[in-house]
Curated annotation (Swiss-Prot):
The modification Phosphoserine is found at S235, S242, S344. The modification Phosphothreonine is found at T270. Residues 1-57, 328-368 are annotated as: Disordered. Residues 32-52 have a biased composition (Pro residues). Residues 1-11 have a biased composition (Basic and acidic residues). It comes from Bos taurus. One of its GO terms (cellular component) is kinetochore. This is F-box only protein 28.
Amino acid sequence: MAAASEERMAEEGGGGHGDGGSPSAIASTQRLPPPPPPQPPQPGSQAPPAPALAPDQLPQNNTLVALPIVAIENILSFMSYDEISQLRLVCKRMDLVCQRMLNQGFLKVERYHNLCQKQVKAQLPRRESERRNHSLARHADILAAVETRLSLLNMTFMKYVDSNLCCFIPGKVIDEIYRVLRYVNSTRAPQRAHEVLQELRDISSMAMEYFDEKIVPILKRKLPGSDVSGRLMGSPPVPGPSAALTTMQLFSKQNPSRQEVTKLQQQVKTNGAGVTVLRREISELRTKVQEQQKQLQDQDQKLLEQTQIIGEQNARLAELERKLREVMESAVGNSSGSGQSEESPRKRKKAAEAIDSLRKSKRLRNRK
């Protein structure tokens, strides 16, 4: 390296060595005219190819920001969301990349929480009294508190995120939610909910208060007019970093619609599950109605049979009563004469009592 530098300095005119060059060489270098200025290329001619640069002479735009968006996101994915939120101060391009990653991070942590809650609920018993004494009761309490915190954050930030006026600013909140969810998944006997969620409640409350007091008044002024991304996208695309900015703006424009589609899909799944439960209940009710109708038909058949039996018994009683009357009348007609005149009233009385007893028995059967 030293020899090469000495040769380069000797070619340029002696460098710092006093005995490295002759006076004639120095004079010749002083008599050389300055190089002519570069002339612009003619319309029909081709520009000469640029000379290759040494590795230590790379252009200044060969930085992290000049990389493709996918590469930047892949690099930033190894960092925490708190660090990503702080990198928004670097430049506009980095700000757009970090905004997109923060918005996606909030949606991802919501999906991760839904997955954890679904797994815990699948292992819990259905009865509320049994859930309280279950080993996963604290897990369910912590996840329910996280769900409440996520809904508050959603109501505070996502209105303006969907309008593309800002991003989900507090990246530290996302990191803390991930920490709580991983703690719940990896611990069999977690601490109480207020102990685990103390840090999350503090930083999320501070973030929401600051957002409502300091940032929302500024964003409300932009709500009636066009948003920032719409004004940025009004400029024509040019190759280079500005084209990547336009691509990022398109992605950020599409995020609200994707989020709405995701919410609609979740609502459709919930409604489908409710419809399935209702159909199952309707089928059970139909089965019960059919069983009751069958029982009613059996009761009607039995009632008809009993009515027929009662009719037959009534007919038999009427016939027996008629025969008894005939026998009594014939007996009364045959008992004539003086000797039998005293006994005839007694026989008539007995016959009348027998007829009355038959009539009473008939009435009782008719009542039954």
